[in-house]
A protein has these predicted regions:
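Alpha-helical transmembrane segments that form the membrane-embedded catalytic/substrate-binding core
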Residues: 161-165, 198-235
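Residues in and immediately flanking transmembrane alpha helices
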Residues: 15-16, 174, 217
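Bacterial Sec-dependent N-terminal signal peptides
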Residues: 1-23
């Protein structure tokens, strides 16, 4: 277990040296209306008087404790980056191949379209519940205060970062199953970073993983997605043989 976590942390630290480029507008495989409806398949966020919310509060203070670990805090700060390019660069090392538009055009195209598609699954619930974020409720800055003003106007439930991160590792694990354990461990860590930063409650992150899984299942009903996935797998085999 210790060796496994060491490899994950090594991947995280190495990735920080990979350059991040500007995002591009891309088409999606489905519209928001065609994606799974979180209001129908997941419960509402915990009521503030519930035991579940007490757990959220406990995890918030756990996150603040984790900030005392300078290495983990630095990872959480980096993970605050919303860009697709950051996610691709961060997961390139556990994936085993540098994911860029130039080096892996088919994988890059697939990931980009998937990312913008899965983004849609959480939008309706965010607007409907408009849940207050932890740093807002406790009236103190998050670990990444430059985002606080914008985030305070955007619902906390579910975690959009977690939806992006978890769906990405699901896809990369399908392309390279041999690295699935390490990829999933990094994807899990990516979601926990949102708790450490103080941008999300634990239940936001948990819901984000479930929403990402539902969105990923929906992607597999798209012929265009399946065709591009086939190209991405072929590209990976060619690059790693």
């Amino acid at each position: 277990m210790k060796r496994h976590m060491f490899l994950v942390l090594l991947c995280v630290c190495f990735c920080s040296s990979i350059s991040i480029k500007a995002q591009e507008k891309v088409s999606t495989y489905f519209t928001q209306e065609e994606m799974p409806d979180m209001l129908k398949f997941l419960p509402a966020p915990p009521d503030t008087l519930s035991e579940a919310f007490s757990h959220d509060v406990m995890r918030y203070f756990w996150g603040k404790q984790m900030r005392q670990d300078s290495v983990r805090a630095a990872i959480a700060l980096r993970d605050a980056d919303w860009s697709a390019e950051y996610i691709f660069s961060e997961f390139s090392v556990p994936f085993g191949l540098n994911i860029t538009k130039e080096n892996t055009p088919e994988i890059y195209k697939l990931l980009t379209q998937c990312l913008y598609t899965v983004d849609l699954v959480g939008k309706k619930a965010k607007a409907f519940y408009n849940r207050k974020r932890p740093f807002d409720r406790f009236k103190e800055p998050s670990l990444y205060p430059k985002d606080d003003e914008a985030l305070s106007k955007n619902g906390s439930y579910p975690s959009g970062h977690t939806i992006r991160g978890w769906s990405t590792v699901l896809l990369l694990s399908e392309i390279n199953p041999e690295r699935a354990d390490t990829l999933l461990a990094r994807g899990y860590m990516y979601g926990e970073s949102r708790v450490i930063v103080g941008a999300h409650w634990q239940s936001d992150v948990d819901a984000g993983r479930l929403a990402a899984t539902a969105a990923y299942m929906k992607l597999h009903t798209s012929d265009a997605f399946l065709e591009q996935l086939k190209k991405a797998k072929a590209e990976f085999r060619k690059k790693t043989k």
